[in-house]
């Protein structure tokens, strides 16, 4: 099962390396990883997406909690949450394809951010499933390049990850 783990950690050199090292040493795969400073400049929020059975995820969270740099963490998938990902995608679009690509982009509420005579660059945000569906709708033969930010997530309601 896919899990999104949100980690509040010290904003110090080497902190990210220790978290990634833990995953690597234990043979856990990281599907996506985002990290940025929080409202408190001494802390960073790391959001890691990984796949595993509940027992494996429990083991990961226990090991993460043992790291000196980790202040607090939560598995967002245990409750209601909001997740978003940004994707930039270059799509071949010539002749009649241009209108079809634009229509598909509109259906998925994407934005065309760059246009050349032979292609569109589209920006799309949403849950990973939405981005995957857009890629499938466009078709692999039309895709020139894809860049994705990785998942960012936050708990719904009044639940807050803070010190």
Language-model segment annotations:
Residues 1-45, 49-163:
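Long, contiguous binding/interaction regions
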